A protein has these predicted regions:
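Catalytic/regulatory signature loops of cyclic-dinucleotide turnover enzymes
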Residues: 9, 30-53, 246
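Charged, alpha-helix-enriched surfaces in structured cytosolic catalytic cores
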Residues: 26-33, 48, 165, 213, ...
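A glycine-rich helix N-cap at a beta->alpha junction
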Residues: 216-219
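Short helix/loop capping segments that flank catalytic or ligand/cofactor-binding pockets
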Residues: 15-16, 57-58, 145-148
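Catalytic NTP-binding/metal-coordinating core of nucleotidyl cyclase/transferase enzymes
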Residues: 1, 123-213
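Intrinsically disordered, glycine/charged-rich C-terminal tails and inter-domain linkers
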Residues: 23, 43-136, 143
């Protein structure tokens, strides 16, 4: 396994993301986006800082932040400055003790009877897991990061409002109209699953056909939501929706 960390600093919006017991914090803004890109840009391990973050802690700018990891000396300086009362060795030791005292046990996979909208994901355990063929679909709001950057200082309330409206609409289309299952929100992207068939068999053609219809419904609902937000003067600008899906074992 390779651990790669990306860090940036700047003004961000912190929002409570999700509904119905599936809440998690989400940070909006250039800093969050740049940090994520640094973390996922390449496969080499290490801690990578943008030039803004490097300057904030007194380091010099570099020509290629995505290829310049912190040195051991720079990491030690950060540790000394932070004066943390915990070490990596302590965390690993406690983790191993927890694994010993609370073993995961064996994994048991069964199939879920469609529609996936009835799947209670929080109730799943290693011994009560699901595995079957289905479509995994992503709908990503294109241009939202630029919209946040343009409005974070003067219009932060509408940024959060637009995000919640658009994602709620996408989730409603997925779960209510097409009986799919939202897996999670990833920033301004929604990830879901959809399956047609029975507990014993996935109907491949029907599943892919419904996923294609779902992609069209995503776009139609997104365009309508943007139109209504513009009429209410909550939004002005350019945003689009990028959709991709694939079929296989989940």
């Amino acid at each position: 396994a390779i651990l790669r960390v990306g860090i940036d600093t700047g003004e961000t919006l912190a929002v409570n993301n999700g509904r119905n017991g599936n809440r998690e914090p989400l940070f909006l803004g250039d800093a969050a986006n740049h940090a994520a890109k640094l973390a996922s840009n390449l496969s080499t391990k290490g801690i990578y800082l943008t030039n803004a973050a490097r300057l904030a802690i007194g380091l010099k700018e570099v020509d290629t932040p995505a290829k310049t990891a912190l040195t051991k000396e720079e990491i030690k300086d950060c540790q000394d400055a932070a004066d943390l009362d915990v070490t990596a060795e302590t965390i690993v030791k406690e983790w191993r003790e927890d694994q010993k005292n609370n073993p995961l046990g064996g994994f048991v996979f069964t199939r879920h009877t469609p529609p996936f909208s009835t799947m209670d994901i929080p109730a799943l355990t290693p011994g009560n897991s699901r595995r079957q063929e289905a479509v995994s679909i992503y709908a990503d709001i294109d241009g939202f990061t630029a919209y946040v950057a343009d409005n974070i200082e003067e219009n932060a309330e509408n940024v959060v409002r637009v995000l919640h409206v658009l994602r709620a609409e996408l989730e409603r289309v997925l779960t209510t109209e097409f009986k799919g299952r939202r897996i999670r929100f990833i920033g301004d992207c929604v990830h879901g699953l959809i399956c047609e068939g029975t507990a014993a068999t996935t109907e491949v053609q029907d599943t892919i056909s419904e996923a294609t219809r779902l992609a069209g419904a995503f776009r139609s609902s997104f365009d309508l939501a943007i139109e209504k937000l513009e009429k209410k003067k909550y939004f002005s600008g350019e945003m689009g929706l990028a959709i991709g899906f694939d079929y296989g074992p989940m």
